């Protein structure tokens, strides 16, 4: 039977002599006519049933040759595997095995960025390192699901995983919602507390307040804040209170709230804390924000800048150098995360320490051994280094 215009399976069975004890294979040929009219011929994927027929054994025998070798004699197993190899059969499909066992032995990680970002961002790399440490110890595989080209929701819906870790999702992330609709065991890291999902996090508000309090106690009364995106709309610029309050990323909403509450508790007016938002998360983004906050008249210029991540804080340090401002003599800078680069910065960066590695490890453990993993709330601590000091006018 010939194929149609767009290519169809067709033709009668073709007999293949494998030379293995008289085994015979019957595989369907297919022909495909591509868009340019070029016809391609090949063999459809060999099935377990065809291998069984070739060897004159049951399908269960072929399946056992792969998954339960102790059920067969060594000679029979070798004959089945050799025949399968010659026929081009690669073994039972992973999807089929997972369906039969009721599990895939795979955990998924839902990322809020594309994969190139995930592999280049120090905090995400540390988090994934912790996840893989736990999955490797448990003999599980890992599937990364990136938020690229708007396809994450479909990928989550179709993913053959036993559980999902959602890393810093937005409050209304559609991919996270898809996982919960599937009733997929889910742990959220750095995101909203959500019905139907477990969580692993830190007290972002209290930790940020501690960093702001440190600067205020040094004598800083004019603060700048650099934050990563609050909404996925690409906005760059100064942030008003309404935009802060409606932020869709819980981590940064809470960190801003901590900075502001510490300032208010010290009697500083709202105007004393100027917030600048960057849609991207890189040293270059932090540098751009630093230029925006520092290139203003003296009476508006902050004497200290709080960055919601260390990556952005490193950019602020770069901006200060480019503007000829000495840190900490002219400007104090504090970050958040305590990535490895923060201790090597010039000067070394004051920051809030959190173990992203441990959080990643515990997210995976909560899925691997539900109910026996460590506490959901992880500790933080302020690490004071050489990037913060009293302001120039402080006695």
Which residues fall in each region the model found?
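Hinge/beta->alpha junction and helix N-cap segments in small-molecule ligand-binding domains
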Residues: 114-125, 147-151, 200-207, 225-264, ...
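N-terminal helix-turn-helix DNA-binding module of bacterial transcription factors
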Residues: 5, 11-103, 395
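Amphipathic helical "hinge" segments at domain boundaries
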Residues: 78, 82, 90-155, 163
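Flexible loop/turn connectors
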Residues: 8-10, 21, 287, 291-395
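Non-catalytic positions within long, well-ordered alpha-helices that form the structural scaffold/packing
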Residues: 53, 100, 156-157, 180, ...
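Flexible loop/hinge segments that line or gate small-molecule binding clefts
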Residues: 170-206, 228-237, 337-349
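Short acidic/polar active-site loop segments enriched in Thr and Asp
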Residues: 58, 105, 162, 220-222, ...
């Amino acid at each position: 039977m010939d194929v149609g215009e767009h290519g169809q399976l067709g033709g009668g069975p073709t007999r293949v002599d494998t030379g293995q004890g008289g085994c015979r294979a019957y595989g369907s040929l297919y022909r495909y006519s591509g868009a340019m009219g070029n016809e391609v011929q090949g063999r459809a994927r060999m099935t377990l049933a065809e291998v069984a027929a070739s060897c004159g054994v049951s399908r269960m025998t072929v399946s056992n040759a792969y998954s339960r070798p102790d059920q067969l004699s060594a000679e029979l197993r070798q004959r089945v595997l050799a025949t399968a190899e010659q026929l081009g059969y690669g073994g039972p499909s992973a999807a089929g095995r997972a369906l039969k066992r009721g599990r895939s032995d795979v955990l998924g990680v839902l990322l809020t960025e594309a994969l190139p970002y995930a592999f280049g961002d120090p905090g995400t790399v540390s988090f994934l390192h912790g996840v893989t440490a736990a999955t490797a110890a448990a003999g599980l595989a890992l599937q990364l699901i990136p938020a690229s080209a708007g396809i994450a929701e479909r990928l989550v819906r179709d993913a053959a995983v036993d559980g999902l870790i959602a890393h810093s999702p937005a409050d209304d992330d559609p991919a996270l919602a898809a996982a919960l609709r599937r009733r997929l065991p889910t742990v959220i890291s750095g995101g909203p507390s959500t019905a139907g999902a477990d969580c692993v996090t830190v007290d972002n508000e209290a930790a940020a307040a501690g960093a702001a309090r440190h600067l205020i106690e040094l004598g800083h009364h004019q603060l700048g804040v650099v934050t990563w995106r609050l909404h996925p709309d690409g906005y760059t610029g100064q942030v008003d209170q309404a935009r802060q309050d409606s932020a869709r990323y819980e981590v940064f909403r809470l960190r801003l709230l901590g900075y502001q509450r510490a300032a208010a508790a010290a009697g500083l007016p709202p105007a004393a804390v100027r917030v600048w938002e960057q849609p991207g998360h890189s040293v270059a983004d932090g540098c751009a924000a630093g230029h925006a906050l520092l290139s203003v008249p003296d009476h508006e210029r902050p004497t200290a800048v709080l960055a919601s991540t260390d990556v952005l804080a490193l950019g602020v340090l770069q901006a200060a150098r480019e503007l000829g401002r000495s840190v900490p003599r002219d400007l104090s800078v504090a970050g958040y995360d305590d990535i490895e680069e923060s201790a090597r910065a010039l000067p070394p960066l004051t920051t809030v320490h959190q173990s992203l590695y441990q959080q990643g490890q515990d997210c995976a453990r909560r899925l691997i051994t539900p109910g026996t993993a460590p506490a959901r709330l992880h500790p933080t601590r302020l690490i004071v280094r050489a990037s913060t000091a009293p302001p120039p006018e402080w006695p």
